[in-house]
Each structure stands twice: as C-alpha cells, then as structure tokens.
C-alpha cells in the first residue's frame, strides 16, 4: 500500500476526529463549520450560506420590569399544539448528507420535541396529488408554482388543511386565501434576491390573521425567530441548519440544532419581557431602513 493510498483511506477518520463534541457547539454557525468538515466541497456547497442582511436591520425594543420566570414557547397550528414555533422544513434527499437521512431527522426532532414536515414529493404531478395523499397526513404542504384551477380542485377533493409555500407578495397571499388555503409559508423559494422576512410585515398586514403565516429563509438564531414572530409569523421552518446537524452528527446533531434554537428563543423572549410567543408584536421590534 502506498503512502497516498493509506492517507486516502484514513481521511474520513481524520475528518471525524476534527469534529468538536456536539455538546460544545454554541450556535448553528459552528454547526455549519462541522458540516463543512464532514462533507465533500460539492455536497457542502449545496447547503452552505445564508443572507443575514435583512435580519441585521431589525432590532428589539424590550420591555423592562416584566416577570419572565415562567416562559411558554408553545404554539398551536391547525388544531395541533407544538412545543415551540420552530418546525423542521420539508427536506429533499437528506440521505445525500448522512446515511441515516430521514430516520435521523425524525429521531433528532423527536428528542427535541420538534415537529417535522414530511419530505417533499416533487415528482407527483398536480393532477395526481389528490390521489397521492398519505392516509396519516394531517396537513398538505404544497410548493409554488401552481395553477389556481388545480388548487381549487384539490381544495374540493380534501378536507385537510392546505398550506402553500412560495408566497412573497400580499396580493398572492390574498389570492391563495380566496382559493381556500388554510396557511401560507412566506418563502423566497428559487428567488434568492428577495428576503422572506422583509416582505413578512406587508403580507401580515394584508392577511390580518385570516390564516397562520409560516416563514423560512436564513433563520439561524433564536433572535431571528423572535423577530419573525413579532412581525406576524406563527412559526418558522428550519432547513439548512438541520441538514448541517445531520451531516456532522446524525440524529444527535439535528437534536442539538433544534434545542439550541429553542433555548435561544426562550432567552431572547425573557430579555424582551415576553412570557409567550403570542405576546410578540411589531411593537417589540424596529426595522431600520436602508
């Protein structure tokens, strides 16, 4: 065996040795670094990066002299009570980043008491969606683009709540509600030049609590999540950080990411004088314009 061959065989073990113990990581940015050590450059490139500019322009306006010894992070969506307004986003092909894939995500999320939105099935044509609904499904999550006629047909075919992802304008949100959707995910899906949290206030004002608003897009800290709650979101979907945790540590990494975000959210709520997520309103934040 040549020296080069021996080094190549040892490379995965050497990489694993460079990973910091998962319990010592303090935020999702460090988890991203661990994922980079674990994955090939091409694989890591698929899930790397974020756009933090919009979050940096939002600051908190805390309330003082409020007793926050007892915090309640729970939130209710579509008749179900959730431990925190932090959900695992639909993630396609997680086994690309870890051999345990979806199983590890489910295990890690369960340990963190977090809800997982099932993986997307992008190969199902719209005309077949109504016949492809799993019997155990509680909510249908659909990703734009879609035709209004198809959405109306699906609405007539099922009594399940329908949530659409990919809404970025107040007009699109109102149109979706008119077509019978029960929830909206504000998402810059395939439109990276637009920040989800930047359009959240206008959509929240237009929707006016007719349906719950969920949101995704570069959420990396508990403070990011609290900003979204204050601006009108009911919950936040976490995608890439979950994949970072999965890639680096499997189920334990997924658990760590979600529990870190939950802990950060609780801390930031207490610092702002908030006892429940429902108390977060626009009065608790300030948006600094460009």
Language model segments and positions:
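Alpha/beta enzyme core
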Residues: 131, 144-215, 226-227, 231-234, ...
